[in-house]
Curated annotation (Swiss-Prot):
Motif annotated as EAR-like (transcriptional repression), chain positions: 24-28
Protein's UniProt name: Auxin-responsive protein IAA21
Segments of this protein annotated with the region Disordered: 27-50
Domain of life: Eukaryota
Pfam families: AUX_IAA
InterPro entries: AUX/IAA_dom, AUX_IAA, PB1-like
GO cellular component: nucleus
Domain PB1: 146-248
Organism of origin: Oryza sativa subsp. japonica (Rice)
Function statement: Aux/IAA proteins are short-lived transcriptional factors that function as repressors of early auxin response genes at low auxin concentrations.
Localization (cell): Nucleus
Induction, per UniProt: By auxin.
Amino acid sequence: MAPPQERDYIGLSPAAAAALATELRLGLPGTAEEAESEGGGGGGTDAAPLTLELLPKGGAKRGFADAIVGGPAGQRREAAGGKAAAAAAEAEEEEEKKKAQAPAAKAQVVGWPPIRSYRKNTMAMSQPALKGKDDGEAKQAPASGCLYVKVSMDGAPYLRKVDLKMYKNYKELSLALEKMFSCFTVGHGESNGKSGRDGLSDCRLMDLKNGTELVLTYEDKDEDWMLVGDVPWRMFTDSCRRLRIMKGSDAVGLAPRATDKSKNRN
């Protein structure tokens, strides 16, 4: 009968120790050896608990901690950021100073080929003189220019225009209107030896077809209709905007002097 074989159930034999060394375990490389060395190499009986370290040991752990806590690496980054912010602030201040001290931009002369600087200065100096001449001519233009106004007549199918600057008094204006409108004429009325203002009372407008007296009126700057001849000629030319030849009966509230004359003649 064969002798019984010995079995190492506890794991004290060298073969069991070798099998334990090659056994697969959970953990980082080298953790089992460190646990055995700390336990005194007691054949793996006092195995260290399996743990996963969050941070590696050595210099990597120190650098990571410095970056989080604010060690040397973090201080260098903060110092670099502070210098960049200071440089940007100085650049902004310099730009603001330049803008504040920059002279007012002059009017650019547009053209091609480009105009040199001395030519630009000459043109800039000559512009105020030209403006002064233009203003003087504009002020003198109304005195020497024309003053055209529209002329309408009750019953006439057309309008005319006259230049008031061409006449010196009301009589010349009445003669000009006679030539323009063939349906009325200019006659001499009774003046009782008194000369009228600018010669207006020495003549009267008559409608030859209907035998009625006509009244010459004008519209002033205030858009009010007035009787021609009540103001001096120069004042009339300055304020006249429109002329209208109407019947004396239609100018009851407008020209009482003309209506009174027509009643006395009748």
